[in-house]
Swiss-Prot record:
Residues 1-16 form the signal peptide. A lipid is attached at residue 17 (N-palmitoyl cysteine). The keyword NADP does not apply. GO terms for cellular component: plasma membrane. It is a lipid-anchor. Its main location: membrane. This is Uncharacterized lipoprotein YvzJ.
């Protein structure tokens, strides 16, 4: 029983620590390189690449600048 409770507690803590970006998508650049894709994936930053423009959620902007530039 203790193992189950510990597992549930750890799962809850880990899921609560993950970022949940919900802001409006804003343009951040023109190019999407392999480095940028990998950095966004590692930092769990969602992105859209449409018509030659790169977009990320507005509330992920600071994280993207600090970690991927």
């Amino acid at each position: 029983m203790k193992k189950i409770m510990l597992f549930l507690a750890m799962t809850s803590i880990l899921s609560a620590c993950q970022p949940n970006y919900t802001g409006k998508y804003i343009e951040i650049g023109d190019t999407l390189t392999d480095y940028t894709k990998e950095c966004f994936k590692e930092n769990e930053i969602p992105y859209k690449y449409e018509k030659g423009k790169l977009y990320i959620p507005e509330d992920a902007f600071d994280t993207a600048i600090y970690t991927c530039s």
